[in-house]
C-alpha cells in the first residue's frame, strides 16, 4: 500500500470539475499541467507524490496532461510545462511555471502552510495526519 500513488491523474474536464467540487471550500488543490515528453515534468514527479502524502488531508495533488486535455490547457492559458496552480474553493490563488522543486514547496507552504502546522479541530497539533485536520490560515 505504501507504493500506491497519491497524485491524481486527471483524464477529463468532467473529472477535473468533479474534483474541484469534491475538494469543498477548505481544501487546496495543487495542479500540475504536464506533458509526457517534458523532461522537467518527469523529474518533479516524485516530489509531487511526497507532497500529496505530506498534505493528504489539506491538499489534493493532481496532474493534467496538456496533450490529452487541451480544453483545460486553454482554459488556464497553459503555454509552458510544467505549470502549477493552487486552487481553493474553485478560485486560482496562484499560477507559476517551472520545475524548481524549492519554488513549488515554498509556494505550497505559503498558501497551504507547512506540513507540521496541521491542527486538529480544537486547535491542538495533530499527531500526523488525523481525519479532523484543518489548514492554518
Across the structure, where does each feature detected by a protein language model lie?
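A short beta-strand-turn-helix
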Residues: 9-28, 70
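Thiol-based oxidoreductase modules, predominantly thioredoxin-like and allied folds used
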Residues: 10-12, 33, 44-71, 78-81
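Conserved beta-strand elements of beta-rich interaction domains across eukaryotes
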Residues: 15, 35-36, 68, 89-91, ...
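Acidic, Ser/Thr-rich intrinsically disordered and amphipathic helical segments
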Residues: 15, 43, 47-50, 91, ...
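Hydrophobic heptad-repeat coiled-coil signature
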Residues: 38-41
